[in-house]
C-alpha cells in the first residue's frame, strides 16, 4: 500500500513539474510594407512583461527564421542554430520597421542597461545587414520608443526624470539613429 501511494505521489509530482517548463508564445506577421511599423510587443505601453516567459515571432521577409525573445536577450533561430542578437535588462519592446530602406525590417527596441545605474536606450538591429545601432547617452538622457499612428516615436528625457525634453520620429540617416522633430 505504501509503495502504491509513493508511486502515485511521484507521478502526481512529475506531472505537476512537467507542466512548468517555458512554452514559447509564437506569433507571425503578414508581409511588411516598408511604410508600416509592426508592433511585436511594448511592455512600456500596455503589454504585460513575462519575466519568466519566452515569445517567438516569424516574419515572411526572413523565411525560416524565428525571432525569440527572453526578457534579457533577443535571438534569431534558423536551421536549429540560435544566434544572439542583443541583450537588455530587460528588453522592453520590439518593433519591426524598415529604417535603412533596404526592403527588410530592422528590429527596433527600447532596452534598459546597467547595474546599479540603469538607463533606457534604443537599439536598432539590422538583421539582413548584421549590424546594430544604438541611441544612448548614459547618465544624461533616457530614450524610449513608442508607436503613434504608423510611426515609431522617440521620447528623450533627462536621465531618471519624467520631463520630456524632445520627441520625434525615429529615423536612420548616415548610419546613425536620429530624432526627426517637426
List each language-model region with its residue ranges.
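Surface-exposed loop/turn elements that mediate protein-protein interactions on large endomembrane-trafficking
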Residues: 70-87, 122-137, 166-182
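Positively charged n-region of N-terminal signal peptides that target proteins for export
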Residues: 1-5
Amino acid at each position: 500500500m505504501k509503495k502504491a501511494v509513493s508511486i502515485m505521489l511521484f507521478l502526481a509530482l512529475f506531472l505537476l513539474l512537467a507542466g512548468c517548463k517555458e512554452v514559447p508564445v509564437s506569433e507571425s506577421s503578414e508581409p511588411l510594407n516598408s511604410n508600416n511599423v509592426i508592433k511585436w510587443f511594448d511592455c512600456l505601453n500596455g503589454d504585460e512583461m513575462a519575466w519568466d516567459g519566452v515569445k517567438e515571432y516569424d516574419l515572411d521577409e526572413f523565411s525560416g527564421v524565428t525571432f525569440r525573445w527572453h526578457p534579457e536577450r533577443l535571438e534569431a533561430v534558423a536551421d536549429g542554430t540560435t544566434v544572439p542578437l542583443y541583450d537588455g535588462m530587460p528588453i522592453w519592446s520590439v518593433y519591426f520597421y524598415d529604417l535603412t530602406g533596404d526592403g527588410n525590417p530592422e528590429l527596433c527596441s527600447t532596452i534598459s542597461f546597467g547595474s546599479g545605474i540603469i538607463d533606457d536606450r534604443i537599439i536598432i538591429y539590422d538583421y539582413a545587414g548584421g549590424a546594430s545601432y544604438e541611441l544612448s547617452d548614459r547618465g544624461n538622457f533616457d530614450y524610449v520608443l513608442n508607436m503613434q499612428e504608423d510611426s515609431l516615436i522617440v521620447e528623450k528625457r533627462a536621465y531618471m526624470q519624467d520631463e520630456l525634453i524632445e520627441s520625434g520620429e525615429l529615423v536612420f540617416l548616415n548610419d546613425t539613429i536620429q530624432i526627426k522633430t517637426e
